[in-house]
Structures are given as C-alpha cells and as structure tokens.
Amino acid sequence: CEINAWSGPFIMAAANTRVVRRTEALLGLRQESYGSNFTYQEHAFHQSWFSAFKSLIITGISVLVLMSPLKRAVKPFLPKPGEGPSKAVQENGWFDCKYIAETEDGEKSVFHMHGKGDPGYKVTSKLVSECALCLIEDAESLPGGFEYGGILTSAAGLGNPLIERLSKVGVNFEGPI
C-alpha cells in the first residue's frame, strides 16, 4: 500500500490541496466529514532521486523567475493565449494519480484515477463539460439535493453522479471512493 518512488513538488498541489480542504469543510457542514484529523498532501512521484531533484530545481527556478522582474524578460518565450499543445500531444497524453488514505488506526487503502489525454487540455475540458452536464441532467440526484448551492467544489456539489459520468468518458476510477 506504499508508493515506492521519490517525491517532488507537483505544480497543481497549491490549488488542489485547497480544493480538497474546502470539500472537507463543505462535507462537514452536512455531517459527512472525512474526520477531525483529516490532512491532505500532494506530490509528484519520480523513479529516481535524480529525477525528483531535477524537478525540484526546475520548479524552484520557474517560480523564482515568474515572481521576479525577470518575468518580463522570459514572457516573450512563453506560450501566448490560444497557443497550446498540438492535437497529437493532446491525444497521446495521459495522467495517473494514486491516493493513499490512512485511517486513524493505521489502516490504508489505495484509490487510483487515470486516463488518456493531456491532463491540462483534453482531460480538463472533459471535466468541465461533464460538471456542466451533471448540473443540468442529474440535478435531482446530486448530493445535498436540487436546492443545495453556494460556492461548492465538484466533489461536494456533484459527488457520485459526476464520478459515474467521468467513468463513461475515459476518466477511470479504481478502489474505494
């Protein structure tokens, strides 16, 4: 139940961790909390220490450059709005996420989410589209009911109906949900 790899920073962790924590808070309001000791961390995994170290250095340099006056110097070399990966890159990309949940008594289980397609473009568009369709077509079966609303996360507001939709479009889920 362990992941035998080196860990390094993951570019989306800053946003994702906040979404997960907001979901936990929203579920707590419905008495469906993950538990009072819930924590969440996110990392990228690498096959070797060198790959993890290289990722750390590249991420660190990128953050420093983009948050300094050097940003103006590198901006002309960055992708412009509307530019992105080719259709072939979008089609041939993939993502593979493993989550390990550990209970207070030390019991662990693994949840796996994976799929084909560039996660930043193709998969994200699937996620957004299926969220919208879920709101329109599955409103009666959403967690909290039809009238539950506010500034929700996809997990708190759409729940299992969204998971079922995503499974039909190539976003695969394995393990306990």
Locate the predicted segments by residue:
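C-terminal catalytic/substrate-binding lobe primarily of soluble NAD(P)-dependent oxidoreductases
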Residues: 1-177
